[in-house]
Amino acid sequence: MIKEIALENFKCYKKLNTIQLAKVNLLAGSNGRGKSSFIQALLLLAQSLDSEKGLNHLEMNGRFVELGTFADVQNSESKGNLTIRYKTDDKDESDILISFSSYENKTQWGEIISFTLSGKELIEEMGSATGENGEQKSHGLGVTSTVAGLSQLYNVYYISADRRGPVDFVKKNDNRDDNQIGIHGEFLINSLAKKGKDFTDKVASELSKILSGATIQVENTDTDYLRFYLDSVNDSKGFRPTNVGFGYSYILPIVMTLMLAEKGAKIFIENPEAHLHPGAQSRLADFLMRKSKERDLQLFIETHSDHIINGLRIAIVDGILEESDARILFFSREGLGDTNVYQIKIDSKGNLSDYPDGFMDEWGIQMSKLV
């Protein structure tokens, strides 16, 4: 598990301030305050580590995020080196600090210039000769790219806020990893087809608990396409998803990912509450917390839903999670200033340690106008 992180000169994060993390982390706050940037920083490291060059260069546009150029993610007021520091809870309790700079003055690249593990520098400097007086230097991790702590960034899943809506059929694709359904859920139907009816029925059962009824069917046709059917009641023949409530298609990638993810995985989810009735949001929260416990998943959930937040509180009251398993991160920012992250804890009775302005207060504000 990643137990803390700090960002410096990454988008709205100017100073290296430490943020404590837990098994389940809810990211809340007004729009444009740094929640998505927080998620992007970790996804950027994960996709870079998984790329051909590893962490020697930042993979700015990859399988998780497309962020443009290195200059696009540098803090606009600083333009200094981009630094990410994180600690893990593995047996070595790795403390990793990584810094990147623009590559040979080319703003589209981010080249690694420092990698320290618990205070020890592991970067190798490699010369790229262009003459005695004009020799340039590049840096690389070399064989040290397998150091402890980096394994925390390999087992990563991401479900974007921009999920694929209702789809009636897709082209067959047998070359995909059936445990990876895509950040938009674009490979979901192929994954269901490969997993078979037993798994599909299990997904339908979980979906039914959240949405009070569900049927899922995949028809393997004689053509190059798979047909997909949904319904809002159990044990039906199903209908085209375009004729069923939008929430079914939008929640399905979340349910499947938590059922397919390897144990110990890091899962990033944006706006799980989208297109869901408040009751369904609460039941989804219960599903998320239970799966986190059962499968030892570390969750990072960006949400604007009080029902998701209260679901985390209830999970602690009901004993599904321990107090130390939960953290609410509330992101705030004034004008062009630094992003401030309030780290809110939950006690055994579900009480919150802090209520910063703008956090779970809109209901009270509206009620005061109605009385």
Model-predicted segments: where are they?
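Switch/communication elements of ASCE P-loop NTPase nucleotide-binding domains
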Residues: 1-73, 199, 213, 219-371
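Phosphate-coordinating catalytic segments in nucleotide- and nucleic-acid-processing enzymes
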Residues: 49-257, 262, 344-371
